[in-house]
Amino acid sequence: MVMDLFQMIAIFFLYFLANPIFYLWLILLYFLSKKRVKEERISFHTRVFRRLADYTIPFLPGLLTGVFLSIVTIGLGLIISWEWITVIVVLYVFFALTLQVQWLTPTYVLGFLLLFYGLEPLLGSMEYVAPIYAELGNIPLVIVATILVLFMIAEGFLIRYHGATYSSPRLERSKRGKWVGLHVAKRIWLVPVVFFIPEGMIPTITHWPVFSVGDVTLQPVFIPFLIGFTQRVRGSIPRMPIQAMGSRVIGLGLLLSLFAIGSYYIPVLAVVLGGLAIVFRELLSYQAKIHEGKQPIFFSTQTKGCIILGVLPNSPAAKMNLEIGETIVKVNGQEVNTETGFYEALQINSAFCKLEVLNHDGEIRFAQGALYDGEHHQLGVLLVKGDVVLQDSIT
């Protein structure tokens, strides 16, 4: 009995690992992490986070989200088929080829699929398309609409509570040619969810769980989904606008759930839901981009103090609990407002430093710590660099 249980769990996860979406996730994160580290080195001559962080940071939130979604899908008894899963895999690969991370979500994948359902009167008679519609027709539109809405709400929660976690700091030139800082939040969460498929579609073992619903016998399987997200922030600390985006996505998901419920009675509403999901999700991203462009740049050089653009993990700055968006006003009693001045003030005492920091509430706090050989020359604090003005040597 115990061995059968272990075999069941092993097979359960083997089917999960056999899904191409899992390997698509690994491949995409490989290239995303490589590009991120390259851009961080261009900005700061050092990486901020290890490449492995792109895998580890989203892993647990995605897993926990999958657990909560699975409770709902099991409770609703959502039934899909392997043919339907195959179409989802193909759509994920298609959207991955666009290189747009934010499109790698069920909002776009299932939204596109629902629109494809709606085109059946036009495309259903075509020789190569008819078999696809024949297989997709086995899955009611209301199920696809329900899955889309559930994942959109889950996407909103992931963005709100985990979207800004370890966002990547960068430097770029402003329109006036000055160096400014920004943060790039780019995540792909892997969300494994339990669905039901008709028994016999996959091989099982003696004690594999099966459920009978009328004349149909069902078996559960783990199916991985991807939820991608990207947002650039220049006008504030990254947490605020990203949390706002998450709240808007949750609200959109709740609003569209009315269409999902209505599609139980009027199936065509599911097709309308697919189109609205794509359009309004794009509008949310566009609105955030426009709003961000109108904001004054938050991470820039200023007359008083050095604003913290980033903090290297496990650095003296991290141990002193310095946070992104705080302003270092004094270093070892010396007022600073440039990266060069900050470094020079640190040299006053090479073994110890004391900082006066203006926190997010506008209050001064003190931070101090010992310095050791081999540590980052700027405590592990990433600042916006200023342009060096060279003196004319000709007199």
Specify the residue positions occupied by each region the protein language model found.
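Structural signature of hydrophobic alpha-helical transmembrane segments
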Residues: 17-32, 73-89, 140-149, 212-222
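N-terminal signal-anchor module of multipass membrane proteins
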Residues: 1-73
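Conserved PDZ fold ligand-binding element
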Residues: 317-339
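Interdomain regulatory linker/hinge segments that flank or connect interaction modules
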Residues: 208, 228-290
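Generic multipass alpha-helical transmembrane bundles of integral membrane proteins
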Residues: 116-238
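Membrane-cytosol interface motif
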Residues: 296-320, 326
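Membrane-helix interface "capping/anchor" motifs
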Residues: 96-109, 232-244
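PDZ-domain C-terminal substructure recognizer with occasional recognition of PDZ-binding tails
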Residues: 343-387
